[in-house]
UniProtKB/Swiss-Prot annotation:
GO terms for biological process: microtubule-dependent intracellular transport of viral material towards nucleus; symbiont entry into host cell; viral penetration into host nucleus. InterPro entries: Late_L2. This is Minor capsid protein L2. It is found in: Virion; Host nucleus; Host early endosome; Host Golgi apparatus. It comes from Human papillomavirus type 49.
Amino acid sequence: MVRARRTKRDSVTNIYRTCKQAGNCPPDVVNKVEQTTIADQILKFGSTGVFFGGLGIGTGRGTGGSTGYVPIGEGPAIRVGGTPSVVRPGILPEAIGPADIIPIDTVNPIDPNASSVVPLTDTGPDLLPGTIETIAEVNPAPDIPRVDTSVVTTSRGSSAVLEVASEPTPPTRTRISRTQYHNPSFQILTESTPSLGESALTDHVVVTSGSGGQPIGGVTPVEIELQELPSRYTFEIEEPTPPRRSSTPLRNITQAVGNLRRSLYNRRLTQQVNVQDPLFLQQPSRLVRFAFDNPVFEEEVTQIFERDVAAVEEPPDRDFLDIAKLSRPLYSETPQGYVRVSRLGNRASIRTRSGATVGAQVHFYTDLSTIDAEESIELSLLGEHSGDATIVQGPVESSFVDLNVQELPQVIEVDPEPTFHSDDLLLDEQNEDFSGSQLVYGSGRRSTTFTVPRFSTPRSDTFYVQDLEGYAVSYPERRNYPEIIYPQPDLPTVIIHTADTSGDFYLHPSLRRRKRKRTYL
C-alpha cells in the first residue's frame, strides 16, 4: 500500500485572507490571527495586574516582532529599500494668558503749525535706549625710580651674574615713656607673692616681661639649679589605673583564692547563712556557746568547740547549732562592691561508734555597710596665712579723720598732749532711761515677784496684781443693766385671718378638731 504524500499547508495569514470572505476558516486559524487563544486571553486579562515589560510573549513567530531582535547596546536595524520612520519632536505647549507689558517711551506731540522740514544737526546719532556708553580712561603709569646696576663680566665659560643692590631700610624710631605716681596711703603687704606687672613695697619695684626680667632694688634673689622635667606628648592620654587587688598578684595566690571561693560558695556542698549579729565580727564564740569574756584572747584564729554530742545544749544563736569548728575570718569583695567577712564552720551532728563525727559545712558571712565620703569643706588657717592670702587693712581702705589736729584745735592750745584720742569714738556709751520702767516688789530669791502697774481710770486709784504673763488692758465698764420685759399670760391670743380669694386657707392649730375616743355599743 502506497502512503499518501502529506502536503504542507499554506501560511495562516494567507489562509485567513482567503477563507474569511467565504466564511469557512478553521477555528485554529481564526484564533491565532484574531488572538483569541487561551494564551492570548491569559495575557490579556493577566496584564491588568502583571507587567512583563516588552518581553515579546505571544502566539506569533519568535522573530521579535516586525523589527526583530536588537542586541543590547546597539541601535535598531535599518532595512535597505525601506522607508525610515520619522520621529517628530514633541511641541511644547504655549502658555495662554496676557502678554508681558513693555514700557514705551513717551513721544512729544507734534504741533500742526510747525514746519515739516527737519533741520540737519552736526551731532552724532543718539544712543539707543538700553545701551550703556563706555568711556575709556587712560591713566599715566607711575614713575618708577631707576636703579643703577653693575654688570660683571668674566672671561670664563660660566654664566653671567647680575648683582642687584637692595634698597636701604629707613631707621625706625622707638620712644618709651614711663610715668610714676607716688601715693603715700597705698601700701602692699610684704607677704604677698609678686606676679607679672605687680609692685611690692614702695621702694621695691619688679619689672618683668613675657620672657624674663631684672629686679631693681631690694635684696638680690638667690639662684638655684633647677631640673628640667620632660614634657608630656600631646597625643598621650592618661587613663585611670584599675584598682589593684593585691600588692603581689601571683598565680599561686590567685589559684588559692579561686579554690577557697569554690569551697565557700558551693551551693550543693556548703550551706549559706547570713549573720546579722555584730558579735560575729569580734566574738563569734559567744554565738556558739555561753562563755565568759576573755579580753586577752583574740578570736582571729580557727576555733574548735569540744563538747559531748549526747548533751543537748541550745546555743545563743540558732544558726550556730552543733558547730564544732569555726575558721578564721576571711575577707572578700561582693559583686556590689561591699566588704564581706566570712567564716567556714563544720557541724558535728552525728557521731559514729568509732568516734568520727559527721556534719555539714556552713558558710557564715556578713556584709559591711558602705562608708559614705563626707563632703570636704574649705578650712581657714588660724594665726598664719600664705603669701597669696587677701588681707584688708582698715587704716588703708577706710577714711579716718584725726580729730586731734583738725576738729579740736582748742584742745591742742590748752594741752599739747591731749588725753582725748579719735579711738575714743569707738566706745559705745550706754544711756540708761527709766521713763518706761515699772516698780517690782519682792523679797528673797525664792519669793514670788509681782509687777504692780498703775493705770489711770475714772474711779479711785486701784492697784492690780498681775500674776500671769502678758499685757494688762484697762477700759471703763458700765453697770447699767437693760430692763427685761416679760409677757403677760392674762391677755387673750388674737388670731388675724386675711381675706384670701384663691380658695386656699391656713387653719390655726387651735381651731383644729380634737380627736375623741368613742365607745361602741
